[in-house]
Each structure stands twice: as structure tokens, then as C-alpha cells.
Amino acid sequence: MTENFDKVTKKVEAMYMKYPYPSPSTESIQTNELLNLLKIFELENGIKLENVKFLDAGTGSGHRITNVAQHYSKCEFLGLDISEKSLEIANVLKNTKKLENIKFRKANLMNNISSLGKFNIVLCMGVLHHLANPAKGLGNLLGTLKKDGIIFLYLYGKLGGHKRMLNKKLISILLAKEKSNYGNGIKLIRELGLNKFEYGWNLNFKSNEEEDSLIVDYLLHANETLYDFNDIDKLFKKSDLYGYTIFGITTGTQGFLFDSSYDIRKKISIPQTNISKFLKSDFSLSYYKSLSLKDKCRVLDIIYEPNGYTIIGFTRQAYEKLSNERLKKNFVKIK
């Protein structure tokens, strides 16, 4: 099995060496999804992220994490990636922004990385689903968590990713034996008008080269696994975490904070999932109210059809410190 993992990892590495993601540009671009996520986490928990050690596992070309490091100047960051080309770009961005609180290094997440030390927060955003064995990769990442640490994951959604995967399959069939010919794949995608991006890929780009990287990651990726709620639950059950909660979901080009409640009284300016918009009568809501938390999550999964999930995994000590009522209400205990 190890040999197969190596083949997959090598394919992914070769792809990102040629098409760094999210951008081959060494210019700073507006990729603030990760920064906004952490700001919301601070706001809901009533905390300030200071003196925190972050591990960004699968940092790519560093555009997102350097924006984060610039904002959280009192925190330390280590960014890991399999692609040396991506890390070269990340280091240029680091130097351009004169950041002293972030370092980058090459690493394979399929290997034991515990020698890197312990971190308060591990970020693995849009990366785990590209590994040959996501469960093993998650285990390796958890080996770097402090006893009161948390991990943020972003995983592709199976239900909302259905059309994208059909388009990906179409291109794969057309390419036939040329599946690794990214240049021809990009040309086909443009000619068929399939370069219309969903959340995470719908970034501003200034050149065909920059769009090429988005196209490859979107429809030509060498390896990816998609998840629904049941798959997420199975993944976390195999881990050593105390439990997890779905922080948010994406559908199309829109993001929602995730909440299984049927009576959301706290009004915030950020869109949230809201079952009462779909189950409008007391009769239908009565059935929903009687469900377990997991079944409520399954119902929301089917209704919203996410193309992505942001999930937070908690150690026991981290959960005991948690003050965010929304996350507590939606917490799925494993142990």
C-alpha cells in the first residue's frame, strides 16, 4: 500500500510544481477566506488569537497564510507543502511583506511529522482530501496538536460537488490516454466554457497563467476524495480526537455558518443555515426536533448540498475551554 501512496503523492507534487495553487504569481492577492474564518472564530468565542502557534498543512503558494500571518503578528506560523515551487512563491510573499513570524518548509503529510513540535492550531484547508489516505494524514496532523489544541479542516462536499465531478469526468474521458496532459485539458475546459469557478476557486486572476492554476485544481486534479456528513463522521471516528463540529459550509459561491438549531434567535450579519426556512410548519418541524444531532446534520446536508465543509476537531481539553454556544450545540462527541 505504501507504494501506491507514493505514486499518488508524486502525481500531486508534479501537478503543483507546474501549477502552484492558488496562484503562480508572487504578487499579493485578495485571498482572505482563511483570515475571515479565524476572525469569525475569534468573534464568536470572544477571544483574541495572540501567542498562538499555527501549523498550516498544505500551505500552497502561501497567499492565504501570509495574509493571516500579517494580521496575527503576535502569533507564530509554520507552513508545509509538498511542492518546492509553491514554497518558493510563499517565501517571496513572506519577504515582500517583511514577515518575521512565519516559516515554510517542504513536507509530505503522508509521513510522520511529529518532529515539527506541538501547535495550538493546525490548519489543513482543502488539502486532506487530496492525500492518498486522508485518515492516515489526519492522524499524522493530530500528532502535532497540543493537549488543548484544535484542528481546522476544509473538505470537499460530495453532494454539492456532483456537477463539478461530472465535468471533471467529461474532460477525463475526452483526454483518454492523455489524462496527465494538463495543457490540453486546460484548452478543452476553456473551449467548453467549464472555467466557471465555485467557492474557493472564484478568485480574481490577471493572466491565463494564473487562471491555469485554478483550472487544474478545479477540474484536472490528480487525486481528490469528496465527503458527505456520513463520510466526515467516519473519518473523525478513526481519529484520537474528543469530537468535532461543522463550523461552516459552502454552496456554489456562498458560505454559511452551520447551525442545526430550528430556532436561531441570535441575529448576526453572517449567513447561517436555517432549517425553519425549509420546514415551515409546526408539523414538519416536530419531526426535525425529534431527531438526533447526527440526523439533523444529515437533513441539512441533503437540503443545502454543500460543496465544501469547514470542520473543527477538538481535543478534550480544547472542548472544555470552548465558550462558543453555536459550536457546542453542534458538537459531535466521539469519545
Protein language model features and the residues they cover:
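Conserved SAM-binding loop of SAM-dependent methyltransferases across substrates and taxa
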Residues: S61-S73
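Rossmann-like AdoMet/SAM-dependent catalytic core
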Residues: K206-K335
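A short glycine-rich, Lys/Arg-flanked "PGG" loop and its adjoining helix->strand segment in the class I
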Residues: K136-K147
